[in-house]
């Protein structure tokens, strides 16, 4: 589990593509790799990946074909920076919201506005089906960053980026057309899906509950 608070950036220094797997080498800070162990989970642009090897400030991860197909990691090239977060430990502060690192869909940056030192970023979902899980002031995780939904229109939503987020993550450098990873709030998904199932199976009982 993660919190959506990016702890540092990593530079992809090597990508080795094989038949059904891609091996990455990511260089980051001493602080971020301190006490990092083999087999540990690490969030790379919001994707939960497993550390396969560590050499000084470089760690290695394997990315399977399904992850490459269903996330924006297939757009990353050598030299590009990604958002990193170590897995949370019990007792630590949860500054964002709980996220699993399991990407539900991707989105495309459809509009970007500079607001003094802030930014307004609009993202269109690649699969409009998932827009039902988006609510005003709800949580969303974009490329591993915990953000608050500012507005929703059709199959798109907007987030407002403060200077700290722009400075410490890659999202401030996004341009129109860039693909980003999206993880919806787990609890919102459970609530929406549960209500939908109840309406489908017992619509009259649900309506009676509302009347009461």
Swiss-Prot record:
GO terms for molecular function: riboflavin synthase activity. One of its GO terms (cellular component) is cytosol. It catalyses: 2 6,7-dimethyl-8-(1-D-ribityl)lumazine + H(+) = 5-amino-6-(D-ribitylamino)uracil + riboflavin. GO terms for biological process: riboflavin biosynthetic process. Pfam families: Lum_binding. Its EC number is 2.5.1.9. Lumazine-binding repeats lie at residues 1-97, 98-195. It comes from the Bacteria. Pathway: Cofactor biosynthesis; riboflavin biosynthesis; riboflavin from 2-hydroxy-3-oxobutyl phosphate and 5-amino-6-(D-ribitylamino)uracil: step 2/2. Catalyzes the dismutation of two molecules of 6,7-dimethyl-8-ribityllumazine, resulting in the formation of riboflavin and 5-amino-6-(D-ribitylamino)uracil. This is Riboflavin synthase.
């Amino acid at each position: 589990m993660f919190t959506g608070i990016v702890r540092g950036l990593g530079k992809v220094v090597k990508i080795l593509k094989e038949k059904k797997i891609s091996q990455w080498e990511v260089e980051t800070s001493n602080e971020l790799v301190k006490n990092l162990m083999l087999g540990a989970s690490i969030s790379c642009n919001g994707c939960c990946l497993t550390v396969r090897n560590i050499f000084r400030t470089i760690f290695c991860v394997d990315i399977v074909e399904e992850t490459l197909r269903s996330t924006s990691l297939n757009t990353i090239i050598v030299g590009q920076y990604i958002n990193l977060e170590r897995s949370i430990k019990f007792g630590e502060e949860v500054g964002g919201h709980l996220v699993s690192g399991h990407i539900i869909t991707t989105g495309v940056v459809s509009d970007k506005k500079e607001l003094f030192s802030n930014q307004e970023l609009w993202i269109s979902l690649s699969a409009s089906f998932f827009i039902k899980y988006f609510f005003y002031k709800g949580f969303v995780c974009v490329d591993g960053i915990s953000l608050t939904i500012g507005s929703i229109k059709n199959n798109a939503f907007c987030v407002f980026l403060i200077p700290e987020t722009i400075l410490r993550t890659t999202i401030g450098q996004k341009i129109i057309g860039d693909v980003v990873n999206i993880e919806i709030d787990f609890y919102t998904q459970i609530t929406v899906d549960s209500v939908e199932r109840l309406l489908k199976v017992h619509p009259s009982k649900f309506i009676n509950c509302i009347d009461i």
